[in-house]
């Protein structure tokens, strides 16, 4: 079927050919189920006794174009986010979902367990209505609130910022990397081989998924911070930072698990306004420690015979990107770089 795309912002509306989709759908994958002790009685149906609870699954929305490339793209979001990360941008342009669908890739968008449309948890949590959006504006390097960075690739109009704030969504249960990776791994079991695209907190879960499942043929990671895994005995010293989350440490895992990451190509991208040296500007220093750890991690991967590359976009002449590289004003250019990398690695057949 052909689907016309209407941008919500007329200023960014562009004339494109209709989006052609052969099939689309959605489903849940992974998760657990438990049964409350006791016996269920219809007369007392509001009591939990003897009843079941299904939860901790991921929610998947997928679209497949005609004559799709061999390997579909699986998109995993980061903290405080959902599959919306990869959909329409805050100012109404097409996101990676549509950009790569137009380029012939099947796309699978996840809401990880206990988030978004997968918001059915088997563990309890308290969700507080906390005013924190100016923190996130600063943490995600849009600027130092209320000021935008001068070269920022984020739209500076009020409506776009409101859309950005409204795409954030809470956990309904504690983040659990094992729960997340079990669900993502089961998705690959269901759909077969593919390429995992991750963002931020989702990148750590991405490494673990790639370890669990050899159907993950490659990993593209946008701005990972935590969750870098190193073989036992090779853990680097923590990297100190003035960032609000303190020093950044890696995670030690068995060598046999780490070596599974050396069997598939990996590329990591970081945006702009990241400090080169330690600084008191906490958001820039926070991401300095993440970038430094990523480089140590890639060095460890390559030392063991792997293929990991870290790309700091300003070093190749691309400036102004925020933490949300995939939805910035230059996201088509960013997609081009990812597409070129996939072609270079023989993954766009």
Regions inferred by a protein language model and the residue ranges of each:
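Short beta-strand element of the alpha/beta-hydrolase
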Residues: 70-78
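The feature captures the conserved acid-bearing segment of alpha/beta-hydrolase catalytic domains
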Residues: 224-304, 309-311
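Conserved acidic catalytic loop of the alpha/beta-hydrolase fold
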Residues: 149, 173-195
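N-terminal cap/lid segment of alpha/beta-hydrolase-fold proteins
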Residues: 10-68
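Catalytic active-site module of serine/aspartate enzymes centered on a nucleophile-bearing elbow/loop
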Residues: 320, 324-349
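Active-site glycine-rich loops that stabilize anionic/oxyanionic intermediates
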Residues: 77-82, 86-89
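Gly/Ala-rich beta-loop-alpha elbow adjacent to hydrolase catalytic centers
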Residues: 197-206
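Conserved alpha/beta-hydrolase
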Residues: 93-119
């Amino acid at each position: 079927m052909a689907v016309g795309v209407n941008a919500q912002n007329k200023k960014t509306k562009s004339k494109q050919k209709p989006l052609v989709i052969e099939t689309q759908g959605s489903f849940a994958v992974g998760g657990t189920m438990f049964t409350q002790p006791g016996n269920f009685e219809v007369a007392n149906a509001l009591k939990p006794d003897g009843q079941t609870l299904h939860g901790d699954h991921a929610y998947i929305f997928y679209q497949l174009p005609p004559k799709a490339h061999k390997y579909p793209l699986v998109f995993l979001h980061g903290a405080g986010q959902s599959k919306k990360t990869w959909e329409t941008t805050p100012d109404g342009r097409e996101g990676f979902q549509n950009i790569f669908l137009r380029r012939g890739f099947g796309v699978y968008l996840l809401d990880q367990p206990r988030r978004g449309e997968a918001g059915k948890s088997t563990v309890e949590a308290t969700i507080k209505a906390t005013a924190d959006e100016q923190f996130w504006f600063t943490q995600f390097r849009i600027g130092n609130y209320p000021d935008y960075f001068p070269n920022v690739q984020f739209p500076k109009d009020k409506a776009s910022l409101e859309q950005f704030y409204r795409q954030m969504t809470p956990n309904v249960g504690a983040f659990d990397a094992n729960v997340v990776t079990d669900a993502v791994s089961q998705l690959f079991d269901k759909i077969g081989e593919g390429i995992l695209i991750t963002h931020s907190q989702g990148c750590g879960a991405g490494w673990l998924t790639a370890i669990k499942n050899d159907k993950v043929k490659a990993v593209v990671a946008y701005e990972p911070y935590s969750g870098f895994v190193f073989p036992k005995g090779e853990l680097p010293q923590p990297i100190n930072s003035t960032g609000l989350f303190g020093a950044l440490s890696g995670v030690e895992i068995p060598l046999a698990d780490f070596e599974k990451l050396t069997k598939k190509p990996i590329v990591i991208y970081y945006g702009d306004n990241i400090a080169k040296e330690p600084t008191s500007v906490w958001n820039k220093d926070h991401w300095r420690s993440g970038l430094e750890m990523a480089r140590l991690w890639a060095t460890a991967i390559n030392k063991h015979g792997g293929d990991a590359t870290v790309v700091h976009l300003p070093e190749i002449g691309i400036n102004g990107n925020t933490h949300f590289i995939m939805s910035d004003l230059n996201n088509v250019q960013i997609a081009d770089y990812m597409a070129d990398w996939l072609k270079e690695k023989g993954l766009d057949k």
